[in-house]
Design a protein with these regions (language model features):
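Extended, Lys/Arg-enriched charged tracts that mediate electrostatic binding to polyanionic substrates
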Residues: 117-131
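Intrinsically disordered, low-complexity linker/loop segments enriched in Gly/Pro
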Residues: 110, 132-133
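Charged, gly/pro-rich active-site loop segments
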Residues: 107-121
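Helix-start/capping segments and mature chain N-termini
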Residues: 1-107, 136-341
């Protein structure tokens, strides 16, 4: 298949509309059939629940061109399940898992020319989302919803190499105790914007959000989970009920245990113990793993000695193994790769 004539290595991580997207409506207690459309505009009532009370959830995943020329997605079933969990928490009708997977397949096939070629470092980013489309003036769930899924090509996240990030401990909370921090709701990200802009203005790449109950444990950043590596090579990930369950983190844990033979522990991680770790990384769909060189806690620098100038050795092995699985150069566990074309 002939690909679009783009400079794939320099397209950046921005929105670029593609040919087709998928739309399905929920009305009268049931989801409609859904269909592909070329129209990228969303037309809704001025009193729609999404506009009045932010009733919305979303997902993020990618399509890849593998070494043999196939077009695949990575563990989309987990995105479908997580979106169903998010919808249920927000009193929205879950979009069925099989329908979700069919929508992903349809959008990728319809935009196959936009899937970057193997070796370019670029991918086709997929954004499924669902929102309250029916009018609501009182504070209550809407009666009508819309599920949509669009695609946009994105360039390599680490153009020219992975430069370690510097983070700061935020004075703000990302989520409330017993709140919605464990689901992928747009309102969580809106809450983090002020803290994010403030951190960037101060010269930091991202925030470190602490647990909202005691503010002594590390949770996550505005859009990624943490991975820490001990001086003995053990992988440690924070455990908390208010952390979004990252599919990338879950996959990296499997890679660490079953591909690299590393010990993995999921437990609460105290801010006070960060100086004991040799490496630190942020994991998520966009970059897989972003290395962190230091975290600044109100003027006090906490440095990670094995990742000050570049991605640390254990973090790099995790990154290379997982991206190899995604790109078809490393054997994948059964069920992880869904071939579309």
């Amino acid at each position: 298949m002939e690909k679009k004539d783009l400079d794939w290595g320099n397209i950046g991580f921005t929105y670029m509309p593609t040919d087709m997207r998928y739309v399905a409506d929920y009305k009268d207690g049931a989801w409609g059939e859904g269909a592909l459309t070329a129209d990228s505009n969303v037309v809704i009532n001025e009193c729609a629940g999404i506009l009045q009370y932010c009733q919305e959830c979303f997902e993020g995943l990618k399509a890849y061109t593998t070494e043999d020329g196939s077009i695949v997605t990575f563990r989309p079933d987990l995105n479908a399940e997580r979106m169903m969990d998010s919808a249920a928490r927000l009193e929205m009708p879950p979009f069925p898992k099989e329908r979700f997977l069919e929508a992903v397949d349809a959008v990728v096939k319809a935009n196959a020319a936009w899937v970057p070629p193997f070796g370019s470092g670029a991918t086709l980013y997929l954004r499924p989302y669902m929102f309250a489309s029916g009018p609501v003036i009182g504070v209550k769930p809407s009666d009508e919803y819309q599920f949509r899924l669009f695609a946009t090509p994105v360039g390599p996240y680490f153009k020219g190499g992975a430069k370690p990030l510097t983070l700061c401990v935020s004075d703000f909370d990302r989520a409330a105790p017993h709140g919605t921090g464990h689901v992928k709701a747009g309102l969580n990200y809106a809450m983090s914007l002020y803290a994010s802009v403030t951190a960037h203005a101060a010269g930091y790449d991202e925030n470190v959000f602490l647990d909202p109950g005691t503010r002594t444990y590390v949770e996550e950043t505005g859009g990624a989970n943490f991975l820490f590596i001990t001086k003995d090579g053990e992988v440690v990930t924070p455990k908390s009920d208010s952390i979004l369950p990252s599919i990338t983190r879950r996959s990296l844990v499997h890679v660490a245990e079953h591909y690299l033979g590393l010990k993995v522990t999921e437990r609460p991680v105290k801010l006070a113990e960060l100086s004991d770790f040799a490496e630190c990384g942020l994991c998520g769909t966009a970059a897989v793993i972003s290395p962190v060189d230091r975290i600044v806690d109100h003027g006090k620098e906490i440095c990670f000695p094995s990742g000050m100038d570049e991605m640390g050795p254990v973090t790099r092995k995790l990154y290379e193994t997982l991206t190899g699985i995604q790109m078809g150069t490393t054997r994948a566990p059964e069920g992880w790769i869904r071939k579309i074309v």
